[in-house]
């Protein structure tokens, strides 16, 4: 069965794999081209393993292509022994034993059947990509293996995987031991060329230039890696314009394309014509594209990035990692020696990250949290290779609470369990259930409006997931201008969700959608993405500012897609909505309450009555003295809170701290660096604050008490900041600071001089040189751990010398200073033996007069 694949390097792993997997989990490391994704899964079919084999792949196009290829190796059709299952599409039968699935499918299979009855092996392919679904799927599979199925075998395969972390994870959480195997890749030498440094907006013209040169100077098909569909179509358009003759054919390859177009890009051209394939990173790994001898790598990719401040997830163009670049380069060496052009200077490439950050740290984890709660646990209890941050978890819990998936205590609700049964983002699932069950309870909506919402909801879900780009900002306009293929795709996706709103697929008609209902559906799913026109711009309900390119922007608009640019959001796809409809949907979010706010123009804190919708201020009016007198304590607290918000928005360097305050902080910072002992501590000493933000957090209560009476910016600057800062330290810390890091020393003249504690950790004594005569041993602080730096000044107060070794200075370079200063300041005392001379602040005449008395 595997004879046609025996030339592939991964074939050498078949025998040890079949021996080991009987009693062990497996970790397989093999570079691109080794054949691990085909040889090893197929090898498991002709063994004692009787159950089904699940092969997880991160991309739909790879799933289809692998299924087609492996079925062909067996001489069968897809759906016989080898089948596949992706969202909304499957080709499996009762005889299917090797099922290739996209990653999100596995978690749903486990949720519906925790024992995974009939499944013998789960293979996690391309695990190095660290997708959120593969991490979660592995965590669930480990729980199944540990609790229910110790006969289940897990197999993790990757091209660039650092195996130590995953081996450690399996050792901790699996009841089954783990074996590791590695294979060489099937790769001919590839010559890597770097072009020049190009900015992001210069990539497309530069890429076209490099492609045209490659067409002229090299043989074979050309595979071009670009960030996304937009860049692909831009390059394709320019290439077509430059094409002099029909000597090559242009293909595009990205996830949202139809199956036939994807297959045409992958397969050899029927007429044998040379191909230029413009692809995203879906061509980076398991996809085999024969005939490629040239790779042109833009070194960019589009990755989903979640912005908590707006609730929006957008595709952001980012640099790939070195590991991804190496994968892409290998595509040029599959059939013969090849060449790769990287569109960057080599020096810049060397600064790229070694590996991409795990997807779980960049994306919205609310869907993952919903699945985790539905499983009956929480993130922290799962065997996740990377845990979401505490901030991510808190944001996700808040989002689920707002739609009723969890209660205020964070407990999973029956409604949350219903949401978890719908295969889309929780907020979109909430839209579907609301349209089916709850919209009827909104008395202000007519029956026609309720029906329109129910019909529009599946289309909004489809649009939100498709991330289609349009020149038109309004969804109603964009739908009219979508291509027939786009309209068909959106309708097809929408029909998948018809059942969840209680409609038949035939009831969904894209051309009959109600414009008003489109905005209402977005408002139901994403209330914090509602935007209110303030003046020339918008304010999102989540608090972020936003802009829109629209001739007549409406007062309210519901945002489906937006792009973060700087500190604002560019609205890309949205739909108008009436305020009356928002009041019907969210009556409790339209509030009127007294607030204290900082007026930037007058620089005064003002008490006002503010009407709001979430974080949007709709109207405000000043409160009279009599109104404020009703509850003075409330306004003291509100004033303090307003000042804290004002200060929190400032960089620390802009806080109203004096130079003396900063010197004191550098003193504390030095104490933290030295871990200065606290002799007066009764028990375990309090840790020293290691950052100013940490210290200010510890002083926040004292700060809040002081801020309540501040009326304007001038009074803020006049606060007793030193007392506030000092309150952050315990009494033993204050005592240790005073004793071991004093803020001044007494110099030989008897004068007390302040020490200057600096940001770099230096402690500087700045004093006129004559006042240190007679100093024969250096000053030290921190029990001798820190030497003082002496900034020795001239009689005019100008720096002459800086040293940490005052004794060495007297014995050495002082002679040169003495010689120069005698000529410049002849009236002052410049002794030959300063270490034993009398310190003074006087001229020689004054010294003589004093001696004569």
Model-derived segments and their meaning:
Residues 1-431, 440, 445, 505-507, ...:
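P-loop NTPase motor module signature
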Residues 104, 278-282, 299, 532-536, ...:
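Conserved helicase core region in the C-terminal RecA-like lobe
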Residues 440-539, 544, 555-744, 785-853:
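Acidic, serine/threonine- and proline-rich low-complexity intrinsically disordered segments
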Residues 538-539, 545-548, 651, 737-769:
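Amphipathic alpha-helical packing elements
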Residues 32, 57, 86, 226, ...:
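Active-site proximal loops enriched in glycine and acidic residues that flank catalytic Cys/His/Asp
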Residues 111-112, 202-203, 307, 352-355, ...:
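Short conserved micro-motifs at the rims of enzyme active sites and ligand-binding pockets
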């Amino acid at each position: 069965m595997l004879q046609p694949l025996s030339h592939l390097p991964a074939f050498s792993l078949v025998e040890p794999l079949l021996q080991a997997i009987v009693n062990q989990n497996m970790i397989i490391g093999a570079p691109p081209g080794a054949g691990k994704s085909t040889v090893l899964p197929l090898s498991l079919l002709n063994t004692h393993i009787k159950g089904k084999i699940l092969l997880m792949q991160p991309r739909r196009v790879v799933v289809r292509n692998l299924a087609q290829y492996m079925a062909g190796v067996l001489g069968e059709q897809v759906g016989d022994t080898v089948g596949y299952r992706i969202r909304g599409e499957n080709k499996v039968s009762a005889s299917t034993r090797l099922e290739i699935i996209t990653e999100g499918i596995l978690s749903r299979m486990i949720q519906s059947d925790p024992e995974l009855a009939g499944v013998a092996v789960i293979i996690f392919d391309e695990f190095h990509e660290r997708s959120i679904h593969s991490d979660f799927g592995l965590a669930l599979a480990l729980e199944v293996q540990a609790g229910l199925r110790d006969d289940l075998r897990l197999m993790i395969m990757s091209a660039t995987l650092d195996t130590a972390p995953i081996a450690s994870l399996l050792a901790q959480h699996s009841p089954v031991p783990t074996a590791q195997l590695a294979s060489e890749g099937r790769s001919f030498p590839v010559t890597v060329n770097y072009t020049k440094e190009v900015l992001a907006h210069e990539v497309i013209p530069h890429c076209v230039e490099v492609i045209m040169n490659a067409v002229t100077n090299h043989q074979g098909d050309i595979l071009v890696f670009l960030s996304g569909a937009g860049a692909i179509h831009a390059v394709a358009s320019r290439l077509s314009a430059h094409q002099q003759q029909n000597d090559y054919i242009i293909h595009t390859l990205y996830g949202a394309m139809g199956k036939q177009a994807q297959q045409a890009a992958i397969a050899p051209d029927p007429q044998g014509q040379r191909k230029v394939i413009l692809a995203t990173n879906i061509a980076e790994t398991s996809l085999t594209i024969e005939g490629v001898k040239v790779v042109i790598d833009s070194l960019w990719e589009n990755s989903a990035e979640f912005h908590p401040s707006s609730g929006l997830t957008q595709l952001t163009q980012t640099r790939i990692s070195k590991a991804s670049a190496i994968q892409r380069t290998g595509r040029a060496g599959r059939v013969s020696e090849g060449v790769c052009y990287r569109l960057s200077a080599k020096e810049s490439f060397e600064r790229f990250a070694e590996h991409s950050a795990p997807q779980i740290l960049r994306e919205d984890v609310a869907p993952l949290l919903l699945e985790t709660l539905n499983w009956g646990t929480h993130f922290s209890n799962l065997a996740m290779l990377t845990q979401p941050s505490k901030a991510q978890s808190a944001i996700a819990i808040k989002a689920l609470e707002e739609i009723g998936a969890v209660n205020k205590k964070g407990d999973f609700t029956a409604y949350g369990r219903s949401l978890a049964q719908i295969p889309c983002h929780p907020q979109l699932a909430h839209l579907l259930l609301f349209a089916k069950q709850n919209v009827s309870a909104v008395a202000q909506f007519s029956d026609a409006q309720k029906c329109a919402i129910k019909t529009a909801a599946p289309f909004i879900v489809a649009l939100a997931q498709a991330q289609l780009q349009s020149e038109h900002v309004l969804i109603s306009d964009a739908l009219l201008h979508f291509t027939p293929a786009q309209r068909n795709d959106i309708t097809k996706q929408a029909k998948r969700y018809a059942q969840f709103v209680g409609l038949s697929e035939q009831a969904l008609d894209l051309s009959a959608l109600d414009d008003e209902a489109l905005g209402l559906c977005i408002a139901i799913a994403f209330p914090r993405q509602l935007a209110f026109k303030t003046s020339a711009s918008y304010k999102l309900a989540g608090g972020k500012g936003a802009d829109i390119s629209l001739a007549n922007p409406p007062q309210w608009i519901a945002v489906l897609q937006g792009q973060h640019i700087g500190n604002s959001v560019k609205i890309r796809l949205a739909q108008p909505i009436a305020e009356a409809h928002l009041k019907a949907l969210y009556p409790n979010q339209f509030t009127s309450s007294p607030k204290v706010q900082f007026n930037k123009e007058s620089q005064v804190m003002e008490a006002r009555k503010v009407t709001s919708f979430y974080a949007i201020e709709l109207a405000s009016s000043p409160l009279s003295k009599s109104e404020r007198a009703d509850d003075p304590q409330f306004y003291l607290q509100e004033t303090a809170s307003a000042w804290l918000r004002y200060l929190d928005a400032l960089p620390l360097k802009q806080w109203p701290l004096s130079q003396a305050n900063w010197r004191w902080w550098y003193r504390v910072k030095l104490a933290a660096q030295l871990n200065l002992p606290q002799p007066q501590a009764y028990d375990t000493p309090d840790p020293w604050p290691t950052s100013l933000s940490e210290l200010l957090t510890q002083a926040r209560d004292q700060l809040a008490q002081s801020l309540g009476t501040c009326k304007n910016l001038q009074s803020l600057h006049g606060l007793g900041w030193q007392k506030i800062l000092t309150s952050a330290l315990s009494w033993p810390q204050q005592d240790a600071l005073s004793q071991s890091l004093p803020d001044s020393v007494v110099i030989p003249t008897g004068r007390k001089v302040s020490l200057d504690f600096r940001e770099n950790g230096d402690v500087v004594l700045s004093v006129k040189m004559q006042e240190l005569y007679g100093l024969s041993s250096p000053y030290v602080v921190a029990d001798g751990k820190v030497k003082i730096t002496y900034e020795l000044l001239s009689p005019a107060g100008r720096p002459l010398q800086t040293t940490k070794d005052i004794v060495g200075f007297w014995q050495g370079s002082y002679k040169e200073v003495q010689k120069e200063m005698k000529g410049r300041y002849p009236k002052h005392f410049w002794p030959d033996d300063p270490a034993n001379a009398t310190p003074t602040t006087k001229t020689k005449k004054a010294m003589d007069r004093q001696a004569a008395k």
